[in-house]
Amino acid sequence: VYKSPTCGCCAEWIKIMEKKGHDVKIKHPFNLKSTKKDLGLPMQLESCHTTVIDGYLFEGHIPERDILAFLANPPEGAMGLAVPGMPQMSPGMAPRNKAYSGFKVIGFDKAGKLTLVNQY
């Protein structure tokens, strides 16, 4: 996970993933925005942290179930998933034990095509 060392909501999202049994490695690049650009993230999908798994990008506060579903069957040409911005009721932002709501999970591919994957 590429993130700012001072971002608390990123740390909360990481805690959720670790509680679910995922081994998370954290990187604090000097210039996070430049790192995102170098990875190929479309800037309109930007959030506070970027996760790279098996060469795919996962931007922002994506629920674990959406990441797992994507990794189980990645669409041809796909680059990853994103939850743009910092939605208040997303993983790492929502109060514990509250249902996720008010945001969309967007798929993006190498051609720049955006696809609605899930909506909470």
Question: What are these language model-derived features?
Answer:
Residues V1-K20:
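Local sequence-structure signature of Cys/Sec-based thiol-disulfide redox active-site neighborhoods
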